Amino acid sequence: MSKHKKIDSYFKRKPSDKDNEDDIASISLPQQNSSFGQVVQPDQQPSKVQKVSIGEPSIGEPSKLNSSKFCIVIDESCDESQREQMAIVLRFVDKNGYIQERFFDILHGKDPTSITLKKAICGVLSQHNLDVSNIRGQGYDGVSNMRGEWNGLHALFLKDCSHAYYVHCFAHRLQLALVAASREVIVVHEFFSKLTFIVNIMCSSSKRHDELQAVKSAELEHLLEIDELITSKGENQIGTLKRVGDTRWSSHFSSICSLINMYNATCVVLLKIIDNGSSSLKRVDADVAYNTMTSFEFILILHMMKEIMGITDCLCQALQLKSQDIVNAMQLVRTTKELIQKLTDGGWQSLLKTITLFCEQHDIYIPDFNNAYIAREGRARHQKDHITFEHHYRVNIFLTTIDKQLQELNRRFSEQTMELLTLSASLDPKDVYKTFNIDNICILVQKFYPMDFNDQEKINLRYQLQHFSLDVVSHSDLKNISTISELSAALTKTGKVNAYYLLDRVIRLILTLPVSTATTERSFSAMKIIKTRLRSKMEDEFLADNMVIYIEKEIAETFTSDSIIDEFKSLKERRAAL
């Protein structure tokens, strides 16, 4: 293998591959010059990778972005060393009208406050000569333990650039974000931990799973015999308990519904384990799970979360659809907020009636709501107010949890954001431009992007749109498309961008909004491949440089061996020429 080919194989391989290590290490001048051999040894790898990564999305992309508008997409996750890493991705529309998302850097958040995060992000942007004033969108992690910091960061960028709009990325699981918000209420957080514990006990072995289904089958047969169940196709199917997961759609809601459905059967199996468990540990776990399941507070939160998550589930599912209908999705946001608010105004009594009936059916003790409530365990020492059980359940749990849900929905879907997305849907070419609306597009520019068009351009835009609405009917390349991103590319491809340059500018601004993106998730997938348990001591700069090359393979492959050697050579003086 030639020296240049060996270098190529190094930079194009996966970071985890070991096949070519010996070949790479042997890239050197004649063996008699032993000092040069050190050039390609592992201690020089960071330098080599850095010199290549410097050019990466760096690889010429910033030069295209200097005067263009772009969006910053930020996410955070822990690496193998348990360091909090923050991925920075830039979203923009290239000269051909295609959406591009480029991984720019990954930063270790040693002091993850809003101010330090902003300073770090601005440092990356300035390194590539990108102006903060050109930011036209912000997208942040869907489910994050840094929610407060993201809120502050969003506000700080808005101060520098008032048109850097935050938009919830539909690719992020909204349900997980709402669950994370509800878990800010301590007892709700404890509830989900207990739910996971119960499901794990029941699903940890096939024997228990079979017992659970056998008990449920016997229960259904008994109810059918006494005519308490109606039989029909698809009714009364025997299910199982569903695990809570942080990646599956509706997993929390499904898990709650499955436990309510299998509640009696679960209790029966737990009692069997308590009496006949094969080990004391299993008997103790079953006893803890049974006591948890038969407590009033657990039943209250179980049914409360079923109601709340049942309302939000329709919206969560709609946002995950591959073909997005923005207008209908925003309408679902409105109805979801209204239904959640209705729970606050008049849902308590209805919920309490359901819970009371459930407890009576399963012989669960219901406390006297007029009695004084005393917090359990360590919290009792910090309890200052003397409150009743009714106040604790209704105010501290029910109303507080609903308030957290509304706050999260309002944060992700503010009235401003909803109006922005609704107006932008007027550019949607689906169904032969069914929603195309000239007035709405002009309002969009006037209200949300006034700094990107001068007064004369705002006037000219309306006339360009009038021409476009007639022109598109007779142009097959523009007529038979279904997304705004396809429209952007079609305008460039057909040369129509020259005639409708103002429309093209509006489209590019809309496409920078991170309505749908998964690049940050892919970044962390790459991080897990690169920084493994065996390579957990990799420092942040070397990790970032490796990730840039690995994620942006298409650009990295455009480098020639000679350019890599020349860059490496420029690092410092060598005793021998490369």
Enumerate the predicted regions with their spans.
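Alpha-helical structural modules in large enzymes and assemblies
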Residues: 1-578
